[in-house]
């Protein structure tokens, strides 16, 4: 496992994580198209967010993130337009350290994320999605 590669998408992903750490929601939103769609399974039920205002509500959840560590288990990209990542995530919560696994897939248009599948693969309680 490791870090994102030194490719255009690798650098874009690193910037995305850095913006999350900085809690810079507006800059994160600037990485998405105006009509972007994000499908999330973080809450064990599908949540669909369309457009910047709904994405803004989704990303408000990052304000509570502390001590985020990302370890990439799988990285696949095609032509600066498609990206699939499996990440081992560790972060601090009020209850202690939470460990989980995500599978993120991005479809990019004009250098911005148009479609984002944000999938929880393993929940903090250890259950597999």
Give, region by region, the residue ranges found by the protein language model:
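A solvent-exposed, acidic/Ser-Thr-rich amphipathic alpha-helical stretch
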Residues: 6, 25-81
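Short solvent-exposed loop/turn micro-motifs enriched in small/polar/acidic residues
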Residues: 11, 67-69, 97-100
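Hydrophobic/aromatic beta-strand elements that line small-molecule binding cavities or substrate pockets
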Residues: 70-76, 89, 101-107
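Short, low-complexity N-terminal intrinsically disordered segments enriched in polar/charged residues
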Residues: 1-30, 34, 128-129
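Short, cysteine-centered beta-strand-loop-beta hairpins and adjacent loop/turn segments enriched
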Residues: 64, 90-99
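Short beta-strand edge/turn micro-motifs at domain boundaries
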Residues: 99-129
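Structural motif
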Residues: 35, 81-82, 105, 112
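A short hydrophobic beta-strand element
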Residues: 79-89
């Amino acid at each position: 496992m490791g870090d994102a590669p030194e490719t255009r998408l690798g650098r874009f992903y690193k910037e995305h994580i850095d913006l999350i750490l900085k809690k810079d929601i507006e800059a994160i939103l600037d990485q998405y198209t105006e009509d972007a769609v994000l499908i999330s399974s973080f809450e064990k039920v599908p949540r669909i967010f369309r457009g910047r205002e709904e994405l803004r509500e989704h990303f408000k959840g990052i304000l509570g993130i502390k001590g985020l560590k990302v370890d990439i288990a799988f990285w696949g990209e095609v032509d600066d337009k498609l990206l699939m990542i499996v990440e081992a995530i560790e972060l601090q919560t009020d209850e202690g350290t939470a460990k989980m696994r995500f599978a993120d897939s991005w479809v990019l248009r004009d250098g911005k994320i148009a479609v984002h599948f944000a999938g929880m693969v393993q929940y903090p309680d250890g259950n597999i999605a």
